[in-house]
Amino acid sequence: LKNTTVNYPSLLTSALYNTVEGFAIKYGVTYTKSFANRRSYAIMPEVRYGFANKTLTANLSGNYFYDPLKRASAGFSVGNGIYDLNNLGTMSQLSTSLNALLFERNFPKFYKRTFITARTNRELATGLQGAASVGYAKSESLNNHTDFSVFDFKDRNFTSNNPFMPGADAPLFPVYKSLNFNASLTYTFGQEYMIRPDGKFYQPSKYPTIKLNYRKGINGVLDSDVDYDFIGLEISKDRINMGLAGYSQVFAGAGKFLNNKAVYFPEFQHFRGNNSLTASPDIRRFLFLDYYLFSTNREYLEAHFEHNFAGLITNKLPLVRKLKLEELVGINYLTQPLKSNYTEYYFGIQRLFLRATYGFAFDKNKQVEHGFRISYGFN
């Protein structure tokens, strides 16, 4: 059909394995329709079935891009699914499957969510984007349903699906209902843009981006069990050019639950931790922080800095120069009531999408962990 595209993954990439669902299939397609006035809409159905827990979930999302000059859209999501307890994500689907099948490790933990959400997004001024959403959901804890692994390691066992009680299948939280409202303002300083017939396109800015976010859990309406107010502020810059010395990137975020009368774990403020040898590169990712144990329903401050020397040192070494390696150093920092002054330092090398780093983690100036980390993908 004219001006229509359908994107669908291969069945191979849709297969997965974890200890909650066992072997499972997660399959979704994206149908996009474009119009002469440069407006478009996209429909995204998805189904998922776990063979061990015998659970079928399905959901449907849609987005309508109705004003390309104002970068405006409206959308919805409805259905249910199996989701990571950490809404920032932990491991990729492939890494989760390989760790469970080959190494008897089930790092990610999951829960079931049934939901309906409406959202909107629009440019309010050049460089200033506003977004809002309202959603109603029912959330349920899940248990493991299989302990199959190709190799059986005598010194380890799979842990439960509760990260705080790894030896017992106790629910992390009761079944609860939530009515949530989210709003955010994102502003990029010195934002330049280009207008074409098919829309308004932002150009990379030399200045940072700030984001103000507010989340509210509305109690009592539609039997909603949650009751909280969260406000957060983030500032980031993905590429700060330093000439021949390379480039840097930085992210800092702070937030506080102004009211936390009823906050269940999926609603906590989460962080991008890492329990594995491998991880996708991300300026917000810690190298050694647990995925779940330090999520908070109080206040926090996190900061991340990384500098890539872009071959400044390795290019001076005749034999190494041909490898086109890039040197990098970085620091990650977190403080919150349960994890005060946690700091990571790391250094490493990178070649295209593959990087190897060695890091040290300190908790209140006491070294608590160190080791190698391998990352793949683009940051």
Model feature map: region roles:
Residues L1-N379:
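Exposed, low-structure sequence patches enriched in small/polar residues
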